[in-house]
């Protein structure tokens, strides 16, 4: 893989609780270049925790450790809050799951996107507005000037997620982390939004971490798939080779996918092996 932007080796995340420290992520390793990497697994497997760790978005109760956690020339483990503020949004951005919880309901859409740009760059307001209009056009919004002046409740869910994509990409980051960005959308709208995201990521040569539980989605959208179970990576495989997955957990997830062409009287139940909690993905 060319142009490695992000290097993660033995990332572990623990949270302090009343009952002691809880391991949420254990010894996760991967690299990311100009590609689309999916992180998949069931709820609670540690997918989002990995994504948030890269931006240091965890609460003070979290402890992040790693042998290597490097973004370009920056050691993220040693980076202070001032340095991280310069990275968040400008060089590495995160698209959240549901725009109705991410967008400010009392602030016009265009002003919110412009704010994401102006916090990192000094531009005249008029120039920033034109940049926002261009970005709304880039995410295939047909009437960008109307949407610019709209409030979040005046646009649809699919359009809201396009607005979030525009907001996260307008500062021209190097890496985008998309945390279940289409799970709140209808299937038809989901594919449209993913097509927009794919087009922009590819055209700009960005790295993408796509967090999802939908194996069918990542199979057609991503280059590589990293499968997590109970905070560990159990398998990393090319998306095109998912049907040849070797780990029983990955195969179990694939077997549980509904198949519209073949009726099954009973959906398979994934049988878990305690050894999965101790084994590590081969390096």
Regions found by a protein language model. Give the residues of each.
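A short, flexible loop at the N-terminus of ABC-type nucleotide-binding domains that lies
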Residues: 2-5, 14-27, 33, 57-62, ...
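Conserved ABC ATPase "signature" region
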Residues: 75, 127-146, 254-255
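A short, surface-exposed alpha-helical micro-motif characterized by mixed small hydrophobic
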Residues: 218-220
């Amino acid at each position: 893989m060319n142009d490695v932007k992000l290097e993660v080796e033995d990332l572990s995340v623990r949270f302090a609780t009343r009952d002691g420290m809880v391991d949420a992520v254990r010894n996760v390793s991967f690299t990311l270049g100009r590609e689309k990497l999916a992180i998949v697994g069931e709820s609670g497997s540690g997918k989002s925790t990995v994504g948030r760790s890269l931006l240091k978005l965890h609460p003070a109760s979290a402890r992040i450790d790693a042998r290597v956690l490097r973004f370009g020339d920056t050691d993220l483990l040693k980076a202070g809050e001032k340095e991280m503020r310069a990275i968040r949004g400008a060089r590495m951005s995160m698209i959240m799951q549901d725009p109705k919880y991410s967008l400010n309901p009392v602030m016009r859409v265009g002003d919110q996107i412009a704010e994401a740009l102006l916090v990192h760059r000094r531009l005249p307001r008029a120039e920033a507005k034109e940049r926002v209009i261009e970005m709304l056009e880039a995410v295939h919004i047909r009437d960008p000037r109307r949407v610019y002046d709209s409030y979040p409740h005046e646009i649809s869910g699919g359009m809201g997620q396009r607005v979030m994509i525009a907001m996260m990409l307008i500062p021209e980051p190097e890496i985008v982390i998309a945390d279940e960005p289409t799970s709140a959308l209808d299937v038809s709208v989901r594919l449209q939004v993913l097509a927009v995201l794919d087009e922009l990521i590819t055209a700009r040569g960005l790295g993408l971490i796509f967090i999802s539980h939908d194996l069918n989605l990542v199979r057609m959208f991503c280059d590589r798939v990293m499968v997590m179970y109970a905070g560990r990576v159990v398998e990393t495989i090319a998306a095109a080779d998912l049907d040849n997955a070797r780990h029983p957990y990955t195969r179990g997830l694939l077997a549980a996918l509904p198949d519209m062409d073949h009726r099954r009287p009973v959906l398979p139940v994934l049988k878990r092996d305690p050894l999965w909690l101790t084994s590590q993905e081969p390096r």
